Amino acid sequence: MLRSHLLLVSSFAILHSSFSAQPNVIVILADDLGWSDTTLYGHTAYYQTPNVERLAKRGMTFTRAYSASPLCSPTRSALLTGQSPARTGITVPNCHVPQVVLQATTGKKAPVDQKAIQPDPVTRLKTEYRTLAETLKDAGYATAHFGKWHLGPEPYSPLQQGFDFDLPHHPGPGPAGSFVAPWKFTNFKEKSPGEHIEDRMAAEAVAWMEQTKDKPFYMNYWMFSVHAPFDAKKANIETHRGRIDPKDAQRSPTYAAMIQSMDDAIGTLLDGLDRLKLADNTIII
C-alpha cells in the first residue's frame, strides 16, 4: 500500500519553451513512502533524498492534495484510468490474490469492532478501461512499465493494458523475495551478486529510453521501494547506522538505506535523460 503520495511534476518542457508536440512522459511512483520521509519538505534530516530535491528544483511541487484512497492498487488503477477507486472497484491492495473478481459487490458482514461494512472489492484492473498507456500508444508513443504493478497477473498485466514492454513482469505486492539479490522473480535474474532491484531497474529503464529515444515514449517507473520486505544494501545500512540521533523519531538505518536506493534510482533516470539529451522534451510526474 501507499501510506501517502508525494507528487512532483518536473516538466522540463514547461520551463523551456522549445518542446515537441509529443513530449516524453515518465511517471515515477514510490511505494509506501511517507510524506515526511524525504528532505524536500524539511521534515527529516536523517533520510537523505538529494535527487528528489534535484527533480523538484527543475519543476513544480504540490503540497496540498487529496487522495481518494491512499493505498497501493487503488492509486495505480486511478493513475492509469483517470477513474476513482470507487468506480473501478479496486479499493484495497489485493490484486495479487488468486480469486478473480471483476465486479464489486455489497459486503455482508464485518468484524464486531468495525463501524462499517465494506464492499467486497475488485481484484483485477479490467481491460475494458482505457488506460493512459493505450491512449498514448494509439498516439504513436512507445510504452514501457518498470517495477511494481499490483493490478493483476496475466491476462491483466501491463502487456494487456497498453504497454509494449514490462520488467520484471511481476504481479506481486512487493519484490520477489527481497530487494537485494538473489531474487525470486520468475524470468528476471540478477547480473551480479547482491544486486539491488532499484539499481537494476533504473539501468534497464535508461537502456530502454536509449533504444527508444527517436520516438516519443511513455514510461512508468513504479518502484518496489520502500514497501516491505525491509532489507537494503548492507553497506548503506551501516553508513546510516552511524548517523543515528537517538532523539530523532526517524532513526531506522534499514529504512534510510531503502530510501537512499529509491533516491539513487531517480538520480540514474535524471542522469540518463541528461546524457541522452532528452530532458528538455520530457515531462516527469
PLM feature spans:
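Formylglycine-dependent sulfatase
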Residues: 19-285
